[in-house]
């Protein structure tokens, strides 16, 4: 695949860039308070529109599944979460806005589309809010108190049930349970599950020695386990695996040379991308011996 360079046109640091579901559109956000959308489906990227609505640096953007239309969420230092929707050709409107967090909103994550249009938002105030759209109305958000200090990242579990690929044809597969994982400034990873429309703490994972900067739940194609990647200010990445008995165990990757800011899984969950503060991105894959091995290395200039 040929590499494309996109001149974002932002006037300050770019904090996030996300492709839509089909890889045709790219959204970027910046400390200049702006969100920009580009058409990258052709040979030359084309800037389409600027979205203005935030009053501070915009940390993250996230595309919803296309079954709901062309919808983009954004999170900002201004304590606001905004959900945008394209209502005409390059014409976007705000369809939901929430300013109830007391401090910066650091991370946002859309639920798998099987769970409906649902957005999780993690904040420096120590909470995560869940925003659900039902019956043409945005419901009052559900609030989860995660930590006494800030939450840096949130990620949804996939809707696929572990072991569904290997179960026999006569096995009754239970409905998936809504779960999220968070990473916070108390060095902890916490997993919450939704039981009778209430979010309860399911598991706490404790191996990091400094702030957890990012968490990412791996896609699941029906194999008999779940995986979560976490990264930290302590320069470590840990891949957590939940076995068939529900027990979580962590496997650390080799120590990195700088703070690890982001982790991201490939579409089928077999390759992990790791982004560090020294501008290096590395790709890792689990071997047959269950050890994670470096398969590619990219240094950004």
Swiss-Prot record:
This is Protein SEC13 homolog. InterPro entries: Sec13/Seh1_fam (IPR037363), WD40/YVTN_repeat-like_dom_sf (IPR015943), WD40_repeat_dom_sf (IPR036322), WD40_rpt (IPR001680). The keyword Nucleus applies. It comes from the Eukaryota. Pfam families: WD40. SMART domains: WD40. The gene is sec13. Present with 21400 molecules/cell in log phase SD medium. Gene3D superfamilies: YVTN repeat-like/Quinoprotein amine dehydrogenase.
């Amino acid at each position: 695949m040929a590499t494309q360079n996109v001149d974002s046109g932002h006037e300050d640091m770019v904090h996030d860039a996300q492709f839509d579901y089909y890889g045709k559109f790219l959204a970027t956000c910046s400390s200049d308070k702006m969100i920009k959308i580009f058409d990258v489906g052709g040979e030359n990227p084309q800037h389409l529109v600027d979205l203005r609505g935030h009053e501070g640096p915009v940390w993250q953007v996230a595309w919803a599944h296309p079954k709901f239309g062309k919808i983009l969420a954004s999170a900002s230092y201004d304590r606001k979460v905004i959900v945008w929707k394209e209502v005409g050709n390059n014409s976007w409107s705000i369809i939901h806005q929430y300013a109830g967090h007391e401090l910066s909103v650091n991370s946002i994550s859309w639920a798998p589309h099987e769970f409906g249009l649902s957005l999780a938002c993690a904040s420096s105030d120590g909470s995560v809010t869940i925003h659900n759209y039902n019956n043409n109305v945005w419901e009052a958000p559900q609030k989860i108190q995660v930590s006494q200090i800030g939450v840096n990242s949130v990620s949804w579990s996939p809707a696929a049930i572990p072991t569904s690929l290997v179960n026999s044809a006569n096995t009754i597969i239970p409905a998936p349970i809504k779960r999220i994982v968070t990473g916070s400034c108390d060095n902890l990873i916490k997993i919450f599950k939704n039981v009778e429309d209430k979010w309860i703490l399911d598991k706490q994972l404790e191996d990091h020695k400094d702030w957890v900067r990012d968490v990412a739940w791996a896609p699941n194609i029906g194999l008999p386990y779940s995986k979560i990647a976490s990264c930290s200010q302590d320069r470590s990445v840990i891949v957590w695996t939940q076995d068939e008995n529900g027990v979580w165990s962590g496997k650390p990757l080799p120590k990195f040379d700088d703070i690890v800011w982001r982790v991201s899984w490939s579409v089928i969950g077999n390759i992990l991308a790791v982004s560090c503060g020294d501008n290096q991105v590395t790709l890792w894959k689990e071997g047959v011996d269950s050890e994670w091995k470096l398969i590619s290395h990219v240094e950004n200039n």
